[in-house]
């Protein structure tokens, strides 16, 4: 029997069996251990979840703002109390190092929930005077039942990023985690119930995106879909959502983000930033700065600093607190990353380090890929143009500011970008020209609860986090009041 046994669906405040009996396995990518057998939701199960959510949403929306706020803040407290327990489960399910999951995944997810819990009482409309005898007032009302579809790289954080603004605005959410990493979303559902969330307001349906995800995007009882994942899948989700019942959508999709290092930059700081922008979470971060642009005159120096830092990476068992680089999320994803690495080798890029699966000793049981750095890369190479979502850095040289801005923008993606320079005038000038939704100056990767995040171009639609996201989980009702006489033309 697997370590965590059979995992059921979470509907109407309790675990329930799927109606069709289909299951899939949760696998620890560090060693291939089957962690759990997880039930897959059927169309009938999704119908149950939607009916439950519709009923629960009416109860939730009727509660006072302060009452809703207190319940979500109670959930924040429980998340923080159980941080280490949840982090340990996230590490087993994703392969991410415990040093990361204990410090980031649950912590930042709880921060977002706390942020939106505090904003609930501030959701208000406007009063617009028309004349002495008439005025208009507006109400921000919830959409109703919304769906969240998560990615596998930050399972519980994404579940919180999606559910926090949705619930804060008075909606109910049906959440489908990635079938690769489903375990912590189910724990989050338990926590919401324990905190006092009415039954049905947060349901979890597990299963594949192709089946369960499509049930959600097609369902007429769902008003909005928020999706995190790849561009190809995102386009299908958006088409299904709009083609079925004209649902609203939020899409947080892929990226191939440029990190531009200028000639006046502190090269040590630049190298530190490049390392974090490529190898944190074993390179499985959508905002990673995988196209590293370096002045041609500084390329050799920069490469030496990167190699020096790669040697300091502590690849190992992700449950070891000393490890800071674990396996990839699955064996299938490892094969995808290795195919990109072979493409890099065959395209003429110069391999500085890595470029292979790690198979020494116990590592042979896991989905480990060595931190990989290519240099002398060209813009047309596949490793430079396509999102790899793994520990693969591409170094490109350039001659002028104008050139590097043009090349940085020469992509269908537009999720993130960054510059490293001591010249703040140049920093702002360049950032204002970069076609990306999230930009960093002399840093990389932080996405605070208050900061709207999302992409330009094919990297997404809409934003997550920040004030504006809360607005997109509501709809405006305008009401005109006439206090004076009414004159008919008939």
Curated annotation (Swiss-Prot):
EC number from the UniProt entry: 1.2.1.8
Phylogenetic placement of the source organism: Bacteria, Pseudomonadati, Pseudomonadota, Gammaproteobacteria, Enterobacterales
Protein name: Betaine aldehyde dehydrogenase
Positions that bind K(+) 2: 246, 457, 460
Residues at the catalytic site: 162 (charge relay system), 252 (proton acceptor), 286 (nucleophile), 464 (charge relay system)
Alphabetical list of CDD domains matching this protein: ALDH_F9_TMBADH
Co-factor binding comment: Binds 2 potassium ions per subunit.
Binding, K(+) 1: 93, 180
